[in-house]
Design a protein with these regions (language model features):
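Transmembrane helix-loop boundary segments of multi-pass membrane transporters
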Residues: 3, 81-97, 119, 130-131, ...
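Transmembrane helix-boundary motif of multi-pass solute transporters/channels
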Residues: 8, 62-98, 218-224, 255, ...
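Inter-helical loop and helix-membrane interface segments of multi-pass membrane transporters/permeases
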Residues: 50-54, 117-139, 154-216, 222, ...
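Hydrophobic, membrane-embedded alpha-helices of multi-pass small-molecule transporters
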Residues: 65-75, 147, 152, 185, ...
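Hydrophobic alpha-helical segments and their helix-loop junctions in multi-pass secondary transporters
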Residues: 107, 151-178, 237-260, 330-334, ...
Length: 615
């Protein structure tokens, strides 16, 4: 093996592209301000004249890109194909889309509206709606810590592959599955009598690189983060299209695609475990229940059309997963084709070489995306090293987008808490402490049993808590925020915009009300208790008892924090600090020239308001 000049040059180009783009953008912005005579450039930050500092605001494009980056993450290419393979193709996709429409999308919409309405991060938002819900906010802060601890280890895998792309020939050229299992993970063959094992230095070093990138990107506010997001959102979309175009032309790709969308087992649709997996996947991918959408929406402009942005993010996120599935399974089909052409795979029971199937290769586990994409790089011929650098950089940036939002949300928790206590330390200090603690926690997942621990925590934290969180958010919205307030706010916030001069209607009204008030909480709680009943009977994943014990302990911590707000609220007797709904209605009525209070907003809400506008 020798160093690949093409790979090194490509990596340098990728590394230098970001700072160069930032320098050019900064130069242009400074020249524009100088030409305009911007006097506010030297305005001081922090509190002025005893007033609370204004919240940083993002433009509409920056807001949309940030939410796209938050939603479109590594899980779209790491978790989604793995679950499709596990549950046999088309049936899982149907369940995924149903859960998207009736659980995840409604949860995402109400988080975005509540964030924009209150102009506060999750703790402040929930306290404003009613103090009894602040325990849910603290539970979401805790789950952010747990997810950040293991999620960035997946990005460390990408860092290792980027480093491997600088070698010619690629170190995984002979066997991509063996490279992932042995060279990257160095895991155990069995769990009997094993502990976590020693920390793997490659993973630890890769994890350090990831957290240094996060620290550099978050330490200096929304403006820097916005510029970074342009690269980390647009780049993966472009590279995914390139991978898709090349992968569908490979030998055996049709077999992989047929498994992906052509295979349908109606019996699987009756398996509640599959529905639980589908629901947890869309919740993990779109990520309502973490509170990040609330925090990001609190930074958007008051006149931003969050309903339209919600639709854009929901559609683009799912489209990315579905399109990515075509690319991944095309490569899996090609892997199957090549294995069979070479004589098949070894049957451990008989010791004979037997033919393999796409279904068998698709069950490669949580590393399916890394194995498939690594193997797919051989299809680019002389450009293998350059394309490998680019594609694994794409995987890295996909994960970084989500990590940025997770970390930014947690940092906002800390900033808001310290502000209440009368302290306002520099943001880089809070970010630095967060990154350091998360790196140390992440080392647990860099051990020889790290990926098994990762899978366990992912199951108990994500599957359980997100189901519970969205159900509780539905109750909070129904009893303390209200559908009418949402409709009035969206209408008032978008009134007079170029595309919505009469304001944005939340349509179809019947569907959204049905989903938020009924299907979202009922389905979430049903799946929560169903999974609980199965895990109590049989330990998850066949992992050791002590590992499942860690998972149960993490879940117990989350469940213990959540009801604290109810206890404090009952003791203190404090209530909601939301402004009266009549105040919002009066503002909307005044905007339409209606002197009296608006009639109930229902199916005829648009005609009511239009009539007032012409009065």
């Amino acid at each position: 093996m020798a160093a690949s000049a093409v790979g090194i040059i490509t990596l340098l180009a990728v590394v230098l592209a970001g700072p160069l783009a930032w320098a050019i953008a900064t130069y242009v912005e400074r020249r524009r301000k100088a030409a305009d005579g911007a006097a506010e450039a030297g305005a001081s930050e922090g509190q002025v004249d005893g007033k609370e500092p204004e919240r940083e605001e993002m433009s509409g494009v920056a807001y949309t890109l940030s939410l796209l980056g938050y939603a479109i993450g590594l899980g779209n290419l790491w978790r989604f194909p793995y679950l499709v393979g596990k549950w046999g193709g088309g049936a899982f996709i149907i369940a995924y889309l149903v859960c998207l429409c009736f659980v995840a999308a409604p949860a995402y919409l109400i988080e975005m509206v509540m964030g924009q309405y209150t102009r506060k991060s999750t703790v402040g938002c929930f306290k404003m709606i009613h103090p009894r819900w602040d325990g849910l906010a603290y539970g979401q802060a805790l789950i952010l810590l747990m997810v950040m601890a293991y999620y960035n280890v997946l990005l460390a895998y990408a860092v290792i592959y980027i480093a491997g792309s600088l070698v010619d020939p690629l170190p995984w050229a002979a066997d991509s599955k063996n490279y992932f299992n042995v060279e990257v993970l160095n895991g155990y063959d069995d769990y009997i009598g094993k502990g976590l094992g020693p920390v793997q230095w490659k993973l630890a070093l890769g994890l350090l690189v990831v957290w240094l990138i996060v620290f550099a990107s978050l330490s200096f506010g929304q403006k820097i983060l916005t510029k970074v997001t342009w690269v980390t959102v647009v780049g993966p979309i472009v590279m995914l299209v390139v991978l898709l175009i090349r992968s569908v032309t490979l030998d055996g790709a049709a077999d992989g695609i047929e498994f992906y969308i052509g295979k349908f087992d109606s019996e699987v649709l009756g398996d509640l475990d599959m529905w639980a997996s589908a629901c947890s996947q869309i919740l993990f991918s779109l990520s309502p229940g973490f509170g990040a959408a609330i925090t990001m929406s609190s930074h958007t402009r008051p006149k931003e059309n969050v309903f339209r942005t919600c639709m854009v993010v929901v559609v683009c996120n799912s489209a990315f997963s579905l399109v990515g599935g075509f690319a991944i399974f095309s490569i899996v089909g090609n892997i199957t084709f090549r294995l069979n052409a070479a004589g098949g795979v070894l049957d451990k029971a008989t010791g004979a070489m037997v033919a393999t199937t796409v279904a068998e290769q698709a069950r490669a586990g949580t590393g399916l995306a890394f194995i498939a994409i690594a193997d797919g790089m051989r299809a680019f011929g002389s450009g293998t090293n350059a394309m490998s650098v680019l594609f694994f950089t794409v995987l890295l940036t996909l994960g970084l987008d989500s990590t940025f939002c997770f970390a930014e949300t947690f940092v906002c928790y800390v900033e808001d808490y310290l502000l209440v206590k009368g302290s306002k330390p520099a943001k880089w200090k809070i970010v630095g402490c967060t990154c350091a603690v998360m790196y140390l926690m992440g080392l647990l997942f860099c051990t020889r049993m790290g990926i098994e621990l990762l899978d366990t925590i992912d199951h108990y934290c994500i599957t359980y808590y997100l189901l519970l969180a969205v159900a509780l958010e539905a109750f909070m919205f129904t009893f303390d925020f209200g559908w009418r307030r949402l409709v009035v706010h969206v209408k008032l916030a978008t009134l007079g915009n170029l595309r919505t001069p009469l304001g944005q209607d939340v349509v179809p009204s019947f569907f959204w009300r049905l989903a938020i008030h009924i299907t979202m909480p009922v389905c979430s709680l049903f799946l929560f208790f169903y999974i609980l009943s199965t895990d109590v009977v049989e330990p998850y994943g066949g992992y050791p008892v002590w590992m499942n014990g860690i998972g149960w302990s993490c879940l117990a911590a989350l469940l213990a924090v959540t009801p604290l707000g109810f206890a404090r609220s009952l003791k203190s007797g404090t209530g909601s600090t939301l402004p009266p709904l009549e105040q919002d209605e009066a503002a909307l009525a005044a905007a339409f020239g209606i002197k009296s209070t608006l009639p109930p907003l229902g199916q005829n809400e648009e005609s009511d308001l239009a009539e007032g506008a012409t009065a």
